[in-house]
Amino acid sequence: MSRPSVFITGANGFIGRSLGAHFAENGYDVRGVDLAADPARNVVAGDVVNPRPWKSHLQGCAVVLHTAAVVSNAVAAGQQWQANVLGTRRVLEAAARAGVERVVHFSSVRAYGDLGFPDGVKETWPLRADGRAYVDTKVAAEATAFAAHASGEIAVTVVRPGDVYGPGSRPWTIIPVEEIKKGRLILPAGGQGVFSPVYIDDLIAGILLAATHPDAAGQDFNLPGVEPVTCKTFFGHYTRMLNKPPPRTVPTRVAIALATAAGTVERFRGRSSELNAETVYYLTRAGGYSRAKAERVLGWVPQVSLDEGMARTEAWLRTEGYLD
């Protein structure tokens, strides 16, 4: 009896690689695409905007996990639209033509906008484009995905992960540690902005359910972690690991000025930088995200507390030399 097959876009990324490992452990034949090939993991080279190099690998797949996206505040808006919106449409088209049963589209809690949503926001709350390229493209990509579902083209499930951390996470593990070591981590809003950490293993468990549960088609799910915390609490775990003082905090306006200046210097030196006003605003959120729908429909309940997740993350960081 043949194994069920799954295809992952962005298969070499943090989440894509973790998904591949977990689906393989659950008996799936795993295939994927990313900008660089990895034959050992059945990953072919390609760009989601151009399906020609990879569309044949969709044949026989039950599910496509569409994780590929530009996840950066430092990339031009046009490039983000190409990858995040047009790329999503191309994946939907290719999957439908190959007879794939379902596409799981990876969005983000940022589709609610970075500010102005209620604490414990539910999936019924409207999404909000706010002029920031990453947010706007996530909103547009969701609309593109649900349009395909509504038209009967292909079944779609949308997931909105919280702030994913753990071994291999660049935005919420590796980069913060590097910034702390350089003495450059400064938190806005006095460190009281709300952070919604979800440990990578908990997220993967939720994705397995979203990809296979019969009631998940046509639905969207927030996938935050056990509980929201302040930014000062979250990033304080990393300063502790490095034997540094707790994160420095300043008023938001000061943080914006500092980040803008530092980011300008980095770009002048020819380096990409996430230091900008957009990153600062994200760390001033006033609320978290409800996971009640994922619990009710999928039976998903995150299991890894922040303390436990950070203990696992610290062990990985030490092994990889990031804490030296």
Question: What function would you assign to each model-found segment?
Answer:
Residues 139, 152-154, 165-175, 201, ...:
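Glycine/proline-rich active-site loop of Rossmann-fold NAD(P)-dependent oxidoreductases
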